[in-house]
Amino acid sequence: MGRFTKNIVLYLLIIAAFVIAIDAFSGQSANKSELSYTGFIQQVQQKKVESVTITNDHGIKGKLKNGTEFNSYAPTDETLIKTLQDNGVEITAAPPEQPAWWMSLLGSAIPIIILVVLFFFIMQQTQGGGGRVMNFGKSRAKLMGEGNVKVSFKDVAGAEEAKQELEEVVEFLKDPGKFTTIGAKIPKGVLLAGPPGTGKTLLAKAVAGEAGVPFFTISGSDFVEMFVGVGASRVRDLFTQAKKNAPCIIFIDEIDAVGRQRGAGLGGGHDEREQTLNQLLVEMDGFGANEGIITIAATNRPDILDPALLRPGRFDRQVIVGRPDLRGREAILKVHARNKPLADDVDLKIIAKKTPGFTGADLSNLLNEAALLAARLNKKVITMAEVEEASEKVSMGPERRSHIVSDKDRKLTAYHESGHAIVAHLLPHADPVHKVTIIPRGAAGGYTMMLPTEEQNYKTKSQLLADIRVALGGRIAEALILDEISTGASGDLQSVTNTARAMVTRWGMSDELGPIVFGEQQEQIFLGKNLGHERNYSEEIAAKIDSEIHRIVEEAYKDVTKLLSDNEKFLHDMANALLEEETIDAKAVDNLYKYGTTKEPEAEEPKVASEADSSIVPEGVDAKKTTSTVADLSEASSNEIK
């Protein structure tokens, strides 16, 4: 129980004791005896009663002639007054009883007391505790001392450049003479920018664990709350505390909550958040000296930060913490696998190859899911099977094996996924097929997984055209074999449209329109940007853009239709294999293409194979025709858009 709550309880107990004491005191009767009504009438008839006072609740307060006072209670008796008069008793009628003064005072004070207590309670909750009700202008930053943070730079992997930048900051704080002797100045601020989950906050924790100096940590959203002026006051208080503890480090997580561009959006530019930002700008690089204070901030939206915040003198360094490459992913997996028992068949390098685009948080979640799966199966070690399943679960969602799928839907899904896989397998510029399944997972009824053979920072025009053709493979397979199309290709068609439009309007891959970017990026008001931009091209150009997009998709559709028609047996074989086995891997896809079955036939005596050797071509398919079709498609996907 907090100090504030204890005080409130104490005050309430004191008030209750006071009320009880007064009530007990006022209820005492001083030298008054109780007299029954019969006894009272007898006393009256014996002429021993001097006077009575009758109250409005039938109560009787009387006085005997010997001076004794008494109380009695009279039932409804119409002859009572006459009896009293006949016996010479002085009669007085008492007015209605008024409550005691203290009762009136207490009745008026209780609502006020309740309101005051409620106000104090709300203020205490608003400020998150701390024992002081009116401390909302104070900084809520947490001071991390030595030993409080167990994370070090050894726990950070996959972001070597960012780690090196921050290691230099820590080294300056530990040995400033090394830098000052040659005239170097430590950066006043370091901005960590990158996608979510790449390790920005982890790097800050590593700095806190390694620095050996006071480390203040606060979130950008902690500056601004419900009162005007609180944000600026908290910024001042934060830097005041930092100056007292210099040299030190201030870490502001999610700085975009307070550092967004000023003067943008609706409603003008004078609001509480902007005043907080102005105060932050002054504290970081104003007239006052902040020697020995280094500010580190993290955000995944550097594009919406105010330019004044990013200039040298405030955040001198902007460190990009991007998604890790192959080597980085392997290093991250090794860090997260330290406390997990892995079986001998687990190869972290293979896992790293199969997880392009994964962030550090994704990889940590992957190994954790693998550990949970192994525990669910009562295993003592984590095998490669659990890691593979966890990888797909993180990417696509959990399997839905209990989901009831009709035979018609299973057949449609099998041909749909076979269409994707066959086009990807036959086109040279498409990513190789890794796995095909018709088991529902997440929101998908089935999926075809393709993995690049190497890390890719860019995509060529040929690869983009191949991606369009692979995406169309599912819809075209449905139309060719089932003579029907379904809504299952909605996501594929969206991907096709987006890629084709980007090729024409963003990447300048159209010979008709040339290397020009059409249309400015639309920024949303809540991101701190302008409300929008006008289209920067004419209606004639808009018509040409639509025509080019349509032409790209139409050509791809025709090419894929021809490819799948020429390899119809391959399509049937793969669909049947999926219906039977539900999941096939890359080796099975290759065997289906060569032998018409998922398993490689037993080795026979070697023989010289001609260009159109029927032993490696599916039965019923013209080898020359198949070879020429693939070659034609390869050439088509490489040609420039005309």
UniProtKB/Swiss-Prot annotation:
The active site is at residue 417. HAMAP family: FtsH. The gene is ftsH. The lineage of its organism: Bacteria, Bacillati, Bacillota, Negativicutes, Veillonellales. Residues 597-610 have a biased composition (Basic and acidic residues). It is found in: Cell membrane. Residues 597-642 are annotated as: Disordered. Homohexamer. It is a multi-pass membrane protein. This is ATP-dependent zinc metalloprotease FtsH. Acts as a processive, ATP-dependent zinc metallopeptidase for both cytoplasmic and membrane proteins. Plays a role in the quality control of integral membrane proteins. Its cofactor is Zn(2+). In the central section; belongs to the AAA ATPase family. Keywords: ATP-binding, Cell membrane, Hydrolase, Membrane, Metal-binding, Metalloprotease, Nucleotide-binding, Protease, Transmembrane, Transmembrane helix, Zinc.
